[in-house]
From Swiss-Prot:
<keyword id="KW-1003">Cell membrane</keyword>
<dbReference type="InterPro" id="IPR019823">
    <property type="entry name" value="Mechanosensitive_channel_CS"/>
</dbReference>
<feature type="transmembrane region" description="Helical">
    <location>
        <begin position="14"/>
        <end position="34"/>
    </location>
</feature>
<dbReference type="InterPro" id="IPR001185">
    <property type="entry name" value="MS_channel"/>
</dbReference>
<protein>
    <recommendedName>
        <fullName>Large-conductance mechanosensitive channel</fullName>
    </recommendedName>
</protein>
<keyword id="KW-0472">Membrane</keyword>
<keyword id="KW-0406">Ion transport</keyword>
<dbReference type="Pfam" id="PF01741">
    <property type="entry name" value="MscL"/>
</dbReference>
<feature type="transmembrane region" description="Helical">
    <location>
        <begin position="85"/>
        <end position="105"/>
    </location>
</feature>
<dbReference type="InterPro" id="IPR036019">
    <property type="entry name" value="MscL_channel"/>
</dbReference>
<comment type="similarity">
    <text>Belongs to the MscL family.</text>
</comment>
<keyword id="KW-0813">Transport</keyword>
<dbReference type="InterPro" id="IPR037673">
    <property type="entry name" value="MSC/AndL"/>
</dbReference>
<comment type="subunit">
    <text>Homopentamer.</text>
</comment>
<dbReference type="GO" id="GO:0005886">
    <property type="term" value="C:plasma membrane"/>
</dbReference>
<keyword id="KW-0997">Cell inner membrane</keyword>
<keyword id="KW-1133">Transmembrane helix</keyword>
Amino acid sequence: MLKEFREFALKGNVVDMAVGIIIGGAFGALVNSLVNDLLMPPLGLLLKGVDFSNLFVVLKEGTPPGPYIALADAKTAGAVTLNYGLFVNALIGFLIMAFAVFLLVRSINRLRSLSEKSAAPAVAPQTKECPFCFSIIPLKAVRCPNCTSQL
């Protein structure tokens, strides 16, 4: 049983999948940092200092009643909130990630199509044109079936 597991684990697909998951996790962290640290602060500045992570709606107030300035204050008070600012951050992160994956898949498909075109052997023509009546005839024909000319 241990031998079978070792063969399964060392197959190329399993190892490739593990590497993909690890790189995907690191790429996800990179995209999250890009969104939270580089894109959202300038966007918040353009929108007059709005911090998207603190955009929320109080559904039910906590023990000290609101208004709550920050999401952390509302959470500390035990308020039930709808955190749409965090959703906006996650949505922007998802769109960036989806676009990056789209570009990656598009590049891989182009490379595949280029390698398939170069690997495909040149197909020899199977037909030719009769020089007398200009109809298409088999390449090995010695007489045209249309005009009966000797080729």
